[in-house]
């Protein structure tokens, strides 16, 4: 699962069972406890939900919106960041039984949540899903030309990340972002 509620908090979790992630009967994430991230949807709305099954695997996504949720994450330095009532984006999947072990495969987005501004909560739009290329030979993923738009600001993002243990990491300088428009924020 990948869960994020603001620019400072993103959580990658693997092999989450029912003790750590709770789903409602339709497969929407309603609570998660990874040890460093503890969140519950409470009375907040779950929006932008979707699912894409394929070949025995499936991706599922959604976003919590509005007051009523509790979201707390402990950062590596021990500080706890709270974003109660904020947007929480999630994506989780059933692992595919067959994946390539070598070569490069390009993927196109099949769906997802609308982007949100972590400072204001404004909901934007996906302008372009870009391209995702996975190099299975060297365990690397590259994102090209993902664009999200807000009122008077369009952000274009890209970058390369390598697999470090079970997680992808940009290694500090692997991501780039630009913005056009009068409302661009750092």
Name each model feature, range by range.
Residues 1-186:
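Mature soluble binding/inhibitory domains
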């Amino acid at each position: 699962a990948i869960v994020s509620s603001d620019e400072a908090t993103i959580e990658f979790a693997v092999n989450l069972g029912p003790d750590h992630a709770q789903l409602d009967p339709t497969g929407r994430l309603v609570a998660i406890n990874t040890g460093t991230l503890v969140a519950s949807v409470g009375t907040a709305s779950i929006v932008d939900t979707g699912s894409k099954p394929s070949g025995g695997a499936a991706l599922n996504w959604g976003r919590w919106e509005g007051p009523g949720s509790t979201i707390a994450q402990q950062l590596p330095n021990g500080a706890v960041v709270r974003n109660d009532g904020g947007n929480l984006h999630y994506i989780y999947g059933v692992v595919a039984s067959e994946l390539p072990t070598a070569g490069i495969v390009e993927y196109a987005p099949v769906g997802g949540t609308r982007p949100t501004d972590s400072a204001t909560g404004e909901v934007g739009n996906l302008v372009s899903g870009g391209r995702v290329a996975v190099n299975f030979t060297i365990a690397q993923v590259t994102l090209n030309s993902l664009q999200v738009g807000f009122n008077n600001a369009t952000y274009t993002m890209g970058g390369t990340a390598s697999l470090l243990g079970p997680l992808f990491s940009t290694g500090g300088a692997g991501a780039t972002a630009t913005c056009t428009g009068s409302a661009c924020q750092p």
